[in-house]
Amino acid sequence: MLRAFTAISNNGIMLEPQFIKQVADTNKGTVRTAKKEVIGKPVSKQAASETRNYMISVGTDPEFGTLYNKSEGSPIIQVGNNDVAVKSGTAQVPDEKTGTYKVGTNETLNSVVAMVPSEDPEYIMYVTVQEPKTWNNNF
């Protein structure tokens, strides 16, 4: 999922995610820097830009934003004064015993992806929580 969202954050160009920018060996005085690895171009620049705009509204739209805190009148996910492009998701969890899906309130897989700053993202964070013990609308 993280790799797929790199295409949205990079104007349609999918990159291999980098978790570490560089590794420094202070004893040897050397630095090894990660190189950008292009995987493909699955979406157009326009589609990526429009998707990011829709993702901004997920956190900023008071009526339809699923990650907008109506009681406080602000986005749930905030990073300084930056607009954050976000998308949340909920999925069913298979029940291995019955071959069907679990049906309890907390028997779900919840996820959120955030890109900051939304116009030209430098960072993407993708978090999943499977079958949370407790739950509220603010994650």
Positions of predicted regions on the chain:
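Stable alpha-helical elements in mature extracytoplasmic
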Residues: 1, 47-54
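Active-site beta-strand/loop architecture of penicillin-binding DD-peptidases
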Residues: 1-37, 59-139
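Short surface loop/edge beta-strand patches of beta-sandwich-type extracellular domains
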Residues: 37-45
